């Protein structure tokens, strides 16, 4: 565009006076050229501003969103579910069974087996302890006799 404007005024005056035309030809093209170059300069920095924040915005939220929810969800529910039910179930029945039959086996296994497991499971180990020692001491001495006689 600027090349066409320079050619038009420059081509006409040189025909009249080449020497005189050179001087006035230089300043006129500078005047119209100056404002024209400034105008397109203004819109250039404007689109520059949105270009900078645009790539910045998507870069920040993208890595933030997947990093926070992804590790949070699987870490919380996975270890919580297996850890709670697994140790809870075996811990309750395991200590109840070995604690009661251990002292009962040497003292009186026959009468203790049917009486101990029944109240131990529904009631708890508390009533099991006072009931076992009381009947067990008197049956300690006859227990070997009963076993021998029953075997015969």
From Swiss-Prot:
Gene Ontology molecular-function annotations: structural constituent of skin epidermis
Tissue: In squamous epithelia lining the nasal vestibule and in the hard palate.
Region span, 14 X 8 AA approximate tandem repeats: 27-137
GO aspect biological process, one term: keratinocyte differentiation
Chief location bin: cytoplasm
Induction: During squamous metaplasia induced by cigarette smoke exposure.
GO cellular component, one term: cell periphery
Sequence repeats: 27-34, 35-42, 43-49, 50-57, 58-65, 66-73, 74-81, 82-89, 90-97, 98-105, 106-113, 114-121, 122-129, 130-137
Residues covered by region (Disordered): 20-40
Location(s) in or outside the cell: Cytoplasm
Coiled coil: none
Keywords on record: Cytoplasm, Keratinization, Repeat
Purpose: Cross-linked envelope protein of keratinocytes. It is a keratinocyte protein that first appears in the cell cytosol, but ultimately becomes cross-linked to membrane proteins by transglutaminase. All that results in the formation of an insoluble envelope beneath the plasma membrane.
Family note: Belongs to the cornifin (SPRR) family.
Protein name per the record: Cornifin-A
């Amino acid at each position: 565009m600027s090349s066409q404007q320079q050619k038009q005024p420059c081509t006409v005056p040189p025909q009249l006076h080449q020497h005189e035309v050179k001087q006035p030809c230089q300043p006129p093209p500078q005047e119209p050229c100056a404002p024209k170059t400034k105008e397109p300069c203004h819109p250039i920095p404007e689109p520059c501003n949105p270009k900078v924040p645009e790539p910045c915005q998507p870069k920040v939220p993208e890595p933030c969103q997947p990093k926070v929810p992804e590790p949070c969800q699987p870490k919380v529910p996975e270890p919580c579910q297996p850890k709670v039910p697994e140790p809870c179930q075996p811990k309750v029945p395991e200590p109840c069974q070995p604690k009661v039959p251990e002292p009962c086996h040497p003292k009186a296994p026959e009468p203790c087996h049917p009486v101990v497991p029944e109240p131990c499971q529904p009631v708890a180990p508390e009533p099991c302890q006072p009931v076992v020692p009381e009947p067990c001491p008197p049956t300690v001495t006859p227990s070997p006799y009963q076993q021998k006689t029953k075997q015969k």
